[in-house]
Amino acid sequence: MEALFGNVLNLQWQQVVMWIIGALLIWLAIKKQMEPSLLLPMGFGAILVNLPQSGAVTQIIDGVTELGPIDVLFDSGIANELFPLLLFIGIGAMIDFTPLLSNPKLMIFGAAAQFGIFFTLCVATVLGFDVKDAASIAIIGAADGPTSIFVANFFQSNYLGAIIVVAYSYMALVPIIQPTVIRAVTTKAERCIRMSYAERPVSKTTKILFPVIITVIAGLVAPRSVALIGFLMFGNLIRECGVLEGLSETAQKDLANLITLLLGLTVSTKMQAASFLTVETLMILALGLVAFVFDTVGGVVVAKIYNIFAKTKINPMIGAAGISAFPMSARVINKMGLQEDNQNFLLMHAVGVNVSGQIASVIAGGMILTLFA
């Protein structure tokens, strides 16, 4: 009996807390449908890795190292940045850049909405985090899970598990966070500004050249962003080339879903109680919220400044769609517009800003890598 149940004596209260956190993530995934393809495997993985002497992670037993499958997956897919890059192919294949190409000035707001990243970097440094850990935490503001994983892993951050949990949790909370912030920094009159939309035709040649040109420009400006932006744009090229419909469909659905599932399960190896239940995790939770809030504020404020000089006013709410949470943020902005005025349709404008934010967040991640590598 002791052989069967002796391991129970190795159980620590911190591990039980992690079981509760894992169960909470599973509940959020199923009941609230918050990023289920990632939070569900992450929650289950958190329980797996916090069982005493869990065979799911690498253990040293009687002087012999026994490799755990989750650690093997981590070394094979995250330590070498393979999973995030493959996921970028799927994301790129999902994105239609037509709203942005028909109104290129929207890219300004995608860039402005990255303000929270650099603001949070400064705050995290002041709070005592090492500059590379601060950069890894700040990139939560990209609202882009794969970029957060890529940057945090590149810098070998000690807080990878916490960063990923916080990043995806706040992405799922965009419909709650953004409306509150937007209402705080805009007036009723500004939120009611109507924007007409007349889609300008965009040639197939332009759609094909766009991912190539963006990759070249980003590579020249931020060389370390080439892997990130390159895989994202390659996915988009598969979508737009017109001769790889089957692969485009596979990348959008099968590849993206499978890699997201593996990411969630694999990242859980960094959610072991000893490294996760720390004061720093609570600080990362707060800093992640700061990053999201100031991303939103940055996009809105730049849109308001634009209105000072523009003949045709834009609704400043669309500036908030510049975060990379695609297409969730665009839908939030459109819903808010309709709540203020049931004839105020902002979806296509918001989508244009949202996809520009996808590009801007990846470039911002590359700039962080270039500056602090």
Regions found by a protein language model. Give the residues of each.
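Intrinsically disordered, low-complexity non-transmembrane regions of multi-pass membrane transporters
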Residues: 1-11, 16, 62-63, 67, ...
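N-terminal alpha-helical transmembrane segments of multi-pass membrane transport
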Residues: 1-65
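Structural signature of hydrophobic alpha-helical transmembrane segments
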Residues: 7-18, 71-87, 132-141, 168, ...
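Alpha-helical membrane segments and immediately flanking helix-loop junctions
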Residues: 75, 79-80, 91-94, 109-119, ...
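Entry/N-cap segments of selected transmembrane alpha helices
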Residues: 97-121, 272-299, 350, 354
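Alpha-helical transmembrane segments
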Residues: 158-176, 287-293, 318
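Membrane-embedded hairpin module used as a gating/binding unit in multi-pass transport
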Residues: 166-243
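Transmembrane helical segments that form the transport core of multi-pass membrane transport proteins
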Residues: 214-302
